[in-house]
Amino acid sequence: MVGVRSFRPADRAAVRDISFRTGFMGESAESFWRHKESWADLWTSYYTDQEPEALHVATMDDAVVGYLAGCRNTAGMRPSTEELTKAVIRRHWLLFRPGTAGFLYRGLFDSMRDRERAGGDFIDPHWPAHLHIDLLPAARGTGLGAALMRRWLQQLEEADSPGCHLLTLVENTRARKFFEKSGFRIHGNPTLVGGMRGKRGERLHQQIMVWNLLRG
């Protein structure tokens, strides 16, 4: 049996685990970030702890195999992504950990040389909401991703939200096609992602995509 439902506190560990296991274009983030707890803090703690009503999970035989983490008002996030990132770096001593320091210092170097690069939160009143979505390999191609997306966009429609945005990697073609099929479109030009590299050492690019509520 497969299905989607609202997040429950008991799902927190599974959501954190999935975020790490799918953190690099659907594969494990371990290739560049070898500290699971700090990764999960960065990418899931706001949603599980501050806005759980906007978090939805996908299940197979009652096991959580994916999630969609939403935020209805990015401008109102407390802490903001930048504040959260700084706090997690301090709390876990990430600048001194062998499994994370290289990525962070490479990102700092990239930020000094890149004129156009991926920044912090995208704030625009036309698309105030945002989302992250991650599925384990076994859940892909089952319709669960589409079901999660429909559930989240319906929640935004019921709240009369004007729109939603997301950030994805240009190089993640499967994800981009899924988002386009879900009604998202490209907004603006891609920007370089600091610190991150592809499997062959190439630079990666971030793309903003947006969805608008269609009013009758």
Predicted ranges, named:
Residues G3-D17:
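A short beta-loop-alpha structural element at the N-terminal edge
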Residues F24-W43, E82-R90:
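Conserved GNAT-fold acetyl-CoA-binding loop/helix
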Residues F32-L55, D61, E116:
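Active-site rim helix/loop that mediates acceptor-substrate recognition in acyltransferases
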Residues V57, A63-R72, R117:
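Conserved beta-strand in the GNAT
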Residues A75, L167, R185-G201, Q207:
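Conserved catalytic-core motifs of GNAT/GCN5-like acyltransferases
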Residues A75-H132, M196:
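Conserved acyl-donor/pantetheine-binding loop and adjacent beta-alpha core of acyl/acetyltransferases
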Residues W127-A129, L156-L169:
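Conserved GNAT acetyl-CoA-binding A-motif
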Residues H132-I133, G141-Q155, K177-K181:
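Conserved acetyl-CoA-binding loop-helix of GNAT-fold acetyltransferases
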